[in-house]
């Protein structure tokens, strides 16, 4: 967590350049490729496992960022043979390096691991450059502790030092491992709140259990497995356990038979239902004598009242504390009806309505030893949710930033307005407030969308602190009323809360507006990451829209380490699919208010594919191929004989508008819904075919490839207007060019797109899906000047217009209507990273095994840079142009190769390019893409840069200079 005194922060730029055994022998399964890669020539035995001893001199590469199932030291994993991953680091001045081999050791304790006694698994030396491998040792059981380390060999066959130890723990793998019961408060029914809001709010229950650790007994380990629905906070001996907030992550927890009767009817027949649980190591918290475990429960999404959702039931808890003593004996403390329950100070909590807290209702010491709970009631058993208990596999929500006020305005009468400088998702925290008992402080989170209320009633006993627990708000400013005395700036901070994802990519350039646009999208995206799903907006709907998610996921992966986040959310989407029909709902986890269309369900194809391209993870494709096929087959049932989709309807009903949206939120008119449906039908079939091909499913590749081609022909036959040479404005031509138009139509379609933008004064006219493709389509078809013009406009409709209006986050509508915290339009920002800066993973060698560096200098830009910590290591690009020439600097991680495109000035040749490090670099060709010639209304004057193209065979920092200066 970081504290920020915010006035104005420049866009984040991640400077990538600017980190005696008893082995258990087993075969290692290697993820994501052949394993040999570019270092195969250095591997003894062609990638077979070989014994190796350190040479006494450390190699040039070293492992770092060790993860288990993409998580850092997870406390509960229920994958029987989890995947272990790392990156390798090397000095950028050391060239041609790679990982030529690896060795993983896994032990049952850190002590054994440090002594080299890998009693669970020792892979031995395995040749290859794979940095993601599956555990291959002794079968793992529930509760097993696994400490692991890795070392790697460099291109010269020299081993690194061992990495620092990392660990994971196995969770409770079987139903029989759970001895605890689901329990709840006796004053609440088992069922959910009614949606009409007639019942009074019920206070959040407190639950506690006292137990003894006999004097003289030494606790070796104590771990608690716990979850509470909708949210819970866990306490032990008077202190909160863990940093997690708003736990657990959101899923489809349970059955809701009423779903079929909602406005957007969906059969309650999902592929899978799950309830995430968490595990915490509490060994150091136990004491001799009395101990107390406690929990506070919130409604969360499990018992929510509101138009966007349908509740499951009243709050409930399951907890199992397992204690192991030094004599080998064990003891369990489990949730059951012997636990005590009382009402707590949180008098009302609802995701949408807000939270009210009355400090007069606090019971000091309620979760600590020595408390008298004789007046408390016994807990009551609760029905177990239909969902399977499963270890939480996504990042938890946490307080990630603390912002200080930048302005405090006194309004009079105990009222203040406080500005924190930018829009965040989270809550404010009151510090050291003094006032009389019963004083009610109301906190109004100022927002353009419904945001919920928040109130704190004081107990009047000295300085008091408070922050919300069971919901979040979206705000830049708050208005306080009922404040006692003067408000001092130190008495109020804003806590930004979101899923714990790390920013690992950064962009910057010479145009401050582009930097600002990228920055406000970054903030918007974080504001919308809660419960390891991404919402459309974090206040009004808070829904995990699959359409918004699929369109922006590539941008997210370019800016964040989002592997664990998307592993979880893509799993939710697959789990929400109807296994009988293949239908994928418009949101996952499903909330009945989510409208959408074909493009929304397309997330089941698009998101796993983008994940594969970015992280190189074939397992993601393997898990989702059947789901992809199921969705494409479902769409096929709604297509006409040619392959065009008009509208879908629930089973046995008329078509529903909110199931048939095409594009969404343009500044003016929408393109044809049918055109958008058919485009995404093609895209899903195409991805299914590509996925099948990657996985060696030749029959699937042929079947879905043929279907994609049939739909493509149908699209071109149905939507092209030969009179105008266009597929229509509002994104029609953009979709067609992305798909690929017939060569004879190409000049006219490009001309139509250019003319349409010019008629709009250089502005866009696209919705969320058309905008996603617009800039890269323009760039790739000789119109990057138009893309740059669109992105640097400051008048409506444009991103710059939002900035001129003072936006610190992206808006839902171009005209400022509705939500002011919607990340969906940020999908187009891949243009900044992949085109303007010019760094992209080669789709034929995904996961940054091969990187394409191809900058597109445009407009008045004089420099740009982009950096990313990829799944293989640190990569970055930086370019500058002056009157004297052009400089391109590329950093290639160990084990990766690259193709580098160096812009050339007029009349320049290969001889005009200078290299800082020629070794390992080979010239390929001069690429001079032909001008798009005028004709039949075509365009002229748009010419790609001429490039000298080079292949780079290994890691290092490479600098290329040419004379393609600023005047070119």
Regions found by a protein language model. Give the residues of each.
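Extracellular/oxidizing-compartment recognition motifs
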Residues: 37-45, 56-539, 547, 564-567, ...
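Signal peptide processing junction and immediate N-terminal pro/mature segment
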Residues: 24-51
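Non-catalytic C-terminal accessory modules of carbohydrate-active enzymes
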Residues: 314-322, 334-365, 391-394, 400, ...
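Bacterial N-terminal signal peptides
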Residues: 11-21, 25
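Alpha-helical support elements that line or immediately flank enzyme active sites
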Residues: 222-226, 231, 236-237, 427-445, ...
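Active-site acid/base region of carbohydrate-active enzymes
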Residues: 231, 336-342, 487-520, 524-529, ...
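C-terminal capping/lid segments that line or modulate ligand- or cofactor-binding pockets
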Residues: 293, 357-358, 540-541, 559, ...
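Bacterial N-terminal signal peptides that target proteins for export
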Residues: 2-12
């Amino acid at each position: 967590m970081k504290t920020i005194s915010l006035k104005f922060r420049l866009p984040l730029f991640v400077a990538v350049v600017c980190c005696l055994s008893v082995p258990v022998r087993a075969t290692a399964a290697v993820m994501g490729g052949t394993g040999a890669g570019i270092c195969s020539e250095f591997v003894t035995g062609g990638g077979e496992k070989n014994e190796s001893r350190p040479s006494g001199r450390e190699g040039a590469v070293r492992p770092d960022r060790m993860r288990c199932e993409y998580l850092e030291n997870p406390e509960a994993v229920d994958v029987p043979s989890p995947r272990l991953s790392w990156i390798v680091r090397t000095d950028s001045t050391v060239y041609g390096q790679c990982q030529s081999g690896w060795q993983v050791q896994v032990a049952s304790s850190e002590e054994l691991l440090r002594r080299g006694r890998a009693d669970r698994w020792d892979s031995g030396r395995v040749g290859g450059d794979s940095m993601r491998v599956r555990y291959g040792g002794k079968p793992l059981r529930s509760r097993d502790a696994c400490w692991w380390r890795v070392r790697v060999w460099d291109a010269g066959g020299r081993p690194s030092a061992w990495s620092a130890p990392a660990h994971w723990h196995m969770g409770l793998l079987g139903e029989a491992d759970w001895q605890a019961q689901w329990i709840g408060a006796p004053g609440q029914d088992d069922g959910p709140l009614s949606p009409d809001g007639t019942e009074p709010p019920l206070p959040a229950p407190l639950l506690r259990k006292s137990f003894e650790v006999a004097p003289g007994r030494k606790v070796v380990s104590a771990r608690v497995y716990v979850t509470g629905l909708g949210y819970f906070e866990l306490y032990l001996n008077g202190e909160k356990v863990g940093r997690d907030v708003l736990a657990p992550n959101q899923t489809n927890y349970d059955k809701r038979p009423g779903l079929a009767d909602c406005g957007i009817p969906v059969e309650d027949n999902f592929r899978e239902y799950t309830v995430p649980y968490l595990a915490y190591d509490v060994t150091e918290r136990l004491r001799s004598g009395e101990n107390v475990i406690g929990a506070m429960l919130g409604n969360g999404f499990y018992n929510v009242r509101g138009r966007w959702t349908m509740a499951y039931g009243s709050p409930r808890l399951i907890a199992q504390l397992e204690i192991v003593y030094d004599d080998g004996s064990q003891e369990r403390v489990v949730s059951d009806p012997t636990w005590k329950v009382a009402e707590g100070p949180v008098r009302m909590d609802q995701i949408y309505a807000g939270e009210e807290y009355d400090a007069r209702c606090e019971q000091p010491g309620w979760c600590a030893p020595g408390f008298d709970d004789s007046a408390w009631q016994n807990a009551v058993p609760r029905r177990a949710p239909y969902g399977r208990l499963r270890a939480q596999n996504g990042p938890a929500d946490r307080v990630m930033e603390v912002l200080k006020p930048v302005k405090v305005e006194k309004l009079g009468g105990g009222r203040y307005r406080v500005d924190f400088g930018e829009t965040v998702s989270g809550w404010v925290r009151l510090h050291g407030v003094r006032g009389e008992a019963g004083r009610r402080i109301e906190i109004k989170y100022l927002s353009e969308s419904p945001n919920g209320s928040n109130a704190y009633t004081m107990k009047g006993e000295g300085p008091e602190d408070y922050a919300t627990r069971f919901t979040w708000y979206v705000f830049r400013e708050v208005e306080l009323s009922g404040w006692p005395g003067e408000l001092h700036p130190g008495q109020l901070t804003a806590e930004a809360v979101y899923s714990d994802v790390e920013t690992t990519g950064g962009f910057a350039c010479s145009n401050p507006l582009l930097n600002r646009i990228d920055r406000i999208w970054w903030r918007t995206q974080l504001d919308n990451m809660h419960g390891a799903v991404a919402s459309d907006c974090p206040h009004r709907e808070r829904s995990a829209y699959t359409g918004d998610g699929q369109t922006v996921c590539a941008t997210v992966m370019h800016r964040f380490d989002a592997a664990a986040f998307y592993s979880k959310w893509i799993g939710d989407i697959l789990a929400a699919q109807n296994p009988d029909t293949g239908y994928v709902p418009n949101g996952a986890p499903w909330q009945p208010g989510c409208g959408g269309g074909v493009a929304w369900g397309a997330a089941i194809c698009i998101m796993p594919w983008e994940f594969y391209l970015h992280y190189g993870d074939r397992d993601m494709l393997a898990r989702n191929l059947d789901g992809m096929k199921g969705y494409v087959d479902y769409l096929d049932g709604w297509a006409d004989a040619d392959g065009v989709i008009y509208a879908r309807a629930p089973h046995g009903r008329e078509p529903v508008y909110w199931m048939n949206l095409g594009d969404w939120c343009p500044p003016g008119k929408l393109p044809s819904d049918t055109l958008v449906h058919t485009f995404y039908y093609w895209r899903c079939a195409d991805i299914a075919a590509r996925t099948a091909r990657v996985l060696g499913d030749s029959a699937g590749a042929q079947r879905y490839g043929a279907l994609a081609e049939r739909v493509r022909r149908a699209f071109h036959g149905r939507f092209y207007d030969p009179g105008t040479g266009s597929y229509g404005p509002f994104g029609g031509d953009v979709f067609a060019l992305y798909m690929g138009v017939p060569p004879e139509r190409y000049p006219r379609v490009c001309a139509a797109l250019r003319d349409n933008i010019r008629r709009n004064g250089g502005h866009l006219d696209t919705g969320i899906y058309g905008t996603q493709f617009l800039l890269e389509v323009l760039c790739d078809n000789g119109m990057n000047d138009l893309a740059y013009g669109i992105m640097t406009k400051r008048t409506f409709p444009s991103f710059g217009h939002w900035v001129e209006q003072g936006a610190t986050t992206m808006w839902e509508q171009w005209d400022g209507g509705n939500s002011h915290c919607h990340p969906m339009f940020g999908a187009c920002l891949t243009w900044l990273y992949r085109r303007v800066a010019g760094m992209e993973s080669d789709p034929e060698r995904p996961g940054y095994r091969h990187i394409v560096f191809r900058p597109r200098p445009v407009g008045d830009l004089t420099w740009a840079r982009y950096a990313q910590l990829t799944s293989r290591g640190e990569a970055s690009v930086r370019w500058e142009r002056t009157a004297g020439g052009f400089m391109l600097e590329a950093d290639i991680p160990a084990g990766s190769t690259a193709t580098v495109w160096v812009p050339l000035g007029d009349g320049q040749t290969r001889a005009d390019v200078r290299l800082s490090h020629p070794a390992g670099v080979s010239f390929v060709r001069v690429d001079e893409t032909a001008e798009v010639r005028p004709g039949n209304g075509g365009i002229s004057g748009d010419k790609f840069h001429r490039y000298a193209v080079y292949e780079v065979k290994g890691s290092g920092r490479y600098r290329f200079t040419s004379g393609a200066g600023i005047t070119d």
